[in-house]
Amino acid sequence: MGEVQREKVAVIIGPTAVGKTKLSIDLAKALNGEIISGDSMQIYRTMDIGTAKVTKEEMDGIPHYMVDIKNPEESFSVAEFQERVRKHIREITERGKLPIIVGGTGLYIQSVLFDYQFTDDAGDVIYREHMEKLALERGVEYVHKKLQEVDPESAERIHANNVRRVIRALEIFHTTGEKMSDQLEKQENELLYDVSLIGLTMDREMLYDRINLRVDIMMDQGLLEEVEGLYNRGIRDCQSIQAIGYKEIYDYFEDRVSLEEAVSQLKTNSRRYAKRQLTWFRNKMDVTWFDVTDGEKTSEILRYIEGKLQLKSNNSK
């Protein structure tokens, strides 16, 4: 028997503001593709401006998935993302289309492409109940701080209010002596799909200028009013509000900083996030990078994907 043919998937990653959205839509048109968002915050409804969510006009008729699927009050896990995206990949492939994942949330994308297993084994029930009791008596932040001490990478990924996931990560460390984040990394070796993994990069100063400009444009587009709407709905201490662009403006509404300080902090946090994204992708994934400092490289990238996945684009003769 021959080897089972793996589904073909194109993936576009890179830091915020580098130009992933436009490229992905151009590629989808050329390659008969449909787009799956690989951004952990674009899943939230009514959080459009601060997440730089793709607009209906930008979509230009290309179907997009994993956008606007949760309310801001709801939590969302890597495991749920993995399950949903793999289902979309199957369905898009069955329709004879090419799944194109685009985004900057590295661990989420990695969990889909590689043979990650998210288990809820029995673990240590006594320890779990003890931590649940601590969360009730001392608060969720106390338990989250304990996770920060032993597994900072998981603590950054899991919001304090997602108590079940926080305690699960602590339980894994308690019972195995290993961090949850390390356990996930050990599972990275096997790709489940025939993948073309493209990364966009550019000169750092140019990228930072683009990020600063994007924040100014977001403010002009109504980011303040968007965040005020969430604030007035009483949305507090949710996973969604930890997103860059929201937590900074929340500080303004809670009189911790001036609006000018909030916007300045938003720019700083966005630049730092872009730097972390690039570092993460370079350390964790085998990416073919395209430098777009001097302009877009759509044709070059299209040819690369055609060759890697043995496809013919609508532009090919």
Curated annotation (Swiss-Prot):
Binding site for ATP: 14-21
An example Gene Ontology molecular-function term: tRNA dimethylallyltransferase activity
Subunit structure comment from the entry: Monomer.
Class of this enzyme: transferase
Gene name of the encoded protein: miaA
Cofactor(s) required, per the database record: Mg(2+)
Annotated function: Catalyzes the transfer of a dimethylallyl group onto the adenine at position 37 in tRNAs that read codons beginning with uridine, leading to the formation of N6-(dimethylallyl)adenosine (i(6)A).
Keywords, comma-separated and alphabetical: ATP-binding, Magnesium, Nucleotide-binding, Transferase, tRNA processing
A Pfam family per the record: IPPT
Region (Interaction with substrate tRNA): 39-42
Binding-site positions, substrate: 16-21
Listed GO biological process terms: tRNA modification
Site residues by UniProt (Interaction with substrate tRNA): 105, 128
Catalytic activity: adenosine(37) in tRNA + dimethylallyl diphosphate = N(6)-dimethylallyladenosine(37) in tRNA + diphosphate
Entry keyword annotation includes Secreted: no
Name recorded for this polypeptide: tRNA dimethylallyltransferase
PANTHER family in the cross-refs: TRNA DIMETHYLALLYLTRANSFERASE
EC assignment: 2.5.1.75
InterPro entries, sorted: Dimethylallyltransferase, IPT, P-loop_NTPase
Intrachain S-S bonds: none
UniProt KW Nucleotide-binding keyword: yes
Family: Belongs to the IPP transferase family.
Organism: Bacillus cereus (strain ATCC 10987 / NRS 248)
